[in-house]
Design a protein with these regions (language model features):
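Mid-to-C-terminal secondary-structure elements
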Residues: 74, 78-94, 103-208
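Short, conserved clusters of charged catalytic residues that mark active-site
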Residues: 31-35, 108, 119-121, 220, ...
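Hydrophobic, regular-secondary-structure patches
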Residues: 1-72, 79-82, 115, 186, ...
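Peri-transmembrane interface segments
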Residues: 1, 179, 188, 192, ...
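Glycine-centered tight turns that cap/initiate beta-strands
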Residues: 45-49, 121, 244
Length: 247
């Protein structure tokens, strides 16, 4: 997992690995929310950035007569650009205003752009997905294949608040996660303890209530996968591929 820092934390209702919490109990856990992402962004100290993302169904993308099917959609807030250190070949990523308002803009992976626009520039064009039109404002640099065959070359990114307009906040075909990047050099255990307490406080949990969420450390997950596979390359499936872990 190369493009996300090892210190990155994923907060959601699922655990990356084995847990002592029984399955029936885990199934009762609520999803993390956009409000909780905002709470963490505002009140969690020593945080470089936090991003809210929504795992949404893959779909077809069309431009005039050209189309690409089964495209993975990264529905994220604007901070994700810096958290994953995405690289733009043309144009730009969406900004805070576009992220907050859910503007229908889109960033295309390299292969998606080349398939939809083989002989013309993609920027400024309107593509269609989920029955909506999105303006292309950026194209990612070519990345190559990832560990599980996934790659941002065959993915696109849209503002998560646009995805929320389409799917709502309680759609069973989606699940959300909060991606948190601590500042460098901080005490990791202390940070996680503070983050845990902040989320418990936001949820109004009592002292004897168990955590109804999981704080997943990317480093621990990476170590497990590295033991199985050796070197890892890329994490284009972080947003769209968690179904491998929970489904």
């Amino acid at each position: 997992i190369s493009s996300l820092d090892n210190s990155t934390i994923i907060v959601m209702r699922f655990s990356f690995g084995p847990t002592d919490v029984p399955r029936w109990k885990r199934q009762q856990f609520p999803d993390v929310s956009y409000d909780e992402y905002q709470y963490i962004s505002k009140y969690m100290p020593d945080t470089e950035a936090a991003s809210f993302s929504l795992n949404v169904p893959s779909t077809s993308i069309k431009f005039e007569e050209n189309s690409v099917s089964n495209v993975e959609i990264g529905a994220v807030t604007y901070e994700y650009y810096d958290i994953e250190a995405l690289q733009i070949a043309e144009g730009r990523f969406f900004n805070e205003s576009e992220s907050n308002s859910g503007t229908p803009v889109i960033i295309l992976g390299d292969e998606i752009a080349k398939t939809l626009f083989p002989s013309t520039l993609a920027l400024g064009k309107k593509v269609r997905l989920y029955g909506r039109k999105f303006v292309v404002i950026g194209v990612l640099k070519k990345e190559g294949s990832g560990l599980f065959g996934g790659s941002k070359d065959t993915a696109v990114f849209i503002p998560v608040n646009m995805a929320r307009k389409i799917f709502g906040d309680n759609n069973k075909s989606t699940f959300p996660q909060i991606i948190v990047k601590p500042e460098k050099g901080i005490d990791n255990e202390g940070y996680i303890a503070d983050l845990t307490q902040k989320i418990r406080m936001a949820r109004g949990l009592k002292p004897d209530d168990i955590n109804d969420f999981f704080i997943n450390q990317l480093k621990g997950f990476k170590d497990v996968i590295d033991d199985i596979t050796g070197t890892m390359n890329g994490i284009g499936w972080v947003i769209s591929g968690f179904s491998l872990l929970v489904g």
